[in-house]
Amino acid sequence: MAWLVKTEPGEYSFDDLVRDRRTVWDGVSNPQALKNLRSMSAGERVFVYHTGDERRVVGRAEVVRAGGAGKDVAVELKAVDRLVRPVPLADLKADRAFAESPLLRQGRLSVVPLSEAQERAIEARARNAA
């Protein structure tokens, strides 16, 4: 399974994760996002998405430690690598794989599950120039 997590780069960017190597991903309050965070398992792939003015997928991470149950759910992520070509939100909106995705339908959802097709679409767009 793969996931996409959103972050405001002015608060904590993918560069910060690369610098820190690992971080505890917490501060999630939306009930659906918390449910998604609880569903993450160690070893799963994670794409990091910058919100705000950037609005693009910028890097890859991996779940190191799952979040467990309870109210204060958090997972530990480690940086994997930066995408060669960041993938803008406009590219995702144009891809049919994302037509029903919570990423587009629930814009404020900060932790989003990705289907295999969506993961492949991000990887393909990250490799190919526009």
How would you label these PLM feature ranges?
Residues G43-F47, V111:
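Hydrophobic/aromatic beta-strand segments within beta-rich folds
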Residues M1-A42, A126-A130:
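Compositionally biased, charged N-terminal/linker segments
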Residues V111-A130:
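Charged phosphate-binding loop/patch that engages nucleotide di/tri-phosphates or the phosphate backbone
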Residues M1, R21, S41-E44, V57-G59, ...:
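A generic structural signal for short beta-strands and their flanking turns/coil linkers
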Residues G10-Y12, V84-R85, E119-A121:
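Short, acidic Gly/Pro/Ser/Thr-rich loop/turn segments
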Residues V58-V112, E116-A117:
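Aromatic- and Lys/Arg-enriched surface recognition patch
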Residues Y49-R55:
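Short, charged beta-turn/beta-strand-edge "cap" motif at the junction between a beta-strand
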Residues F47-V48, E62:
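Hydrophobic beta-strand signal
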